[in-house]
């Protein structure tokens, strides 16, 4: 028998949580952080606002949990047998995510609150760690095949692969084209092959 208040997989509590978190992402996408409120989320989710407040004390913690839940969605990482193709495909995947309405909205929210002491401010490191864990095999396989130097840091390589794309979205507002994604992948690969991402002492 379930304890009182326990969240049962597939139960009403779990369904309510899923509906509320989905409503948060939809509100962020449609209206942005400034116009999002517990009340608008509750209305979209079809629940009373007191239901939301019982679980999440404020807007910040509510949005943080929704973003964490969204980050749990795994990306299908490329595994073509060639590091150049893998990195190019990965950059294109990131581009597609960032140019979607939902991806652009959530990324801007994360960036805008990255220095918050709690709530949303704690999500970005968690999201990056999750995505890095997924992408790391691309680098380890490439090292094993002799395509990249031993000791190549997956973290550094992925930062340099994605940074130009985030820069276009968040700083310059330049179009995020497939060509720009391919260029980012090529630049990161060239640096990796040159040993730029091998920490001192590991080479």
What is the meaning of each model-derived region?
Residues 75-104:
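Hydrophobic alpha-helical connector segments
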Residues 118-144, 155:
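Amphipathic alpha-helical packing segments from all-alpha helical-bundle domains
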């Amino acid at each position: 028998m379930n304890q009182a208040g326990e969240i049962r997989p597939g139960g009403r509590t779990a369904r309510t949580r899923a509906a509320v978190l989905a409503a948060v992402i939809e509100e962020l996408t449609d209206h942005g952080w400034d116009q999002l409120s517990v009340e608008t989320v509750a209305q979209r989710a079809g629940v009373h606002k007191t239901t939301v407040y019982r679980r999440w004390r404020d807007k910040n913690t509510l949005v943080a949990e929704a973003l964490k839940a969204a980050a749990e969605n795994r990306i299908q990482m490329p595994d073509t047998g060639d590091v150049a193709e893998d990195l190019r495909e990965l950059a294109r995947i990131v581009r597609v995510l960032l140019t979607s309405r939902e991806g652009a909205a959530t990324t801007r929210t994360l960036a805008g609150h990255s220095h918050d002491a709690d709530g949303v401010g704690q999500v970005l490191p968690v999201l990056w760690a999750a995505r890095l864990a997924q992408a790391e095999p691309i680098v380890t396989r490439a090292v094993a095949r002799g395509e990249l130097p031993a000791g190549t840091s997956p973290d550094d390589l992925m930062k340099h692969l994605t940074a130009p794309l985030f820069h276009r979205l968040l700083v310059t507002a330049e179009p995020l084209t497939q060509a720009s994604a391919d260029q980012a992948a090529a630049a990161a690969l060239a640096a990796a092959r040159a040993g730029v991402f091998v920490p001192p002492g590991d080479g």
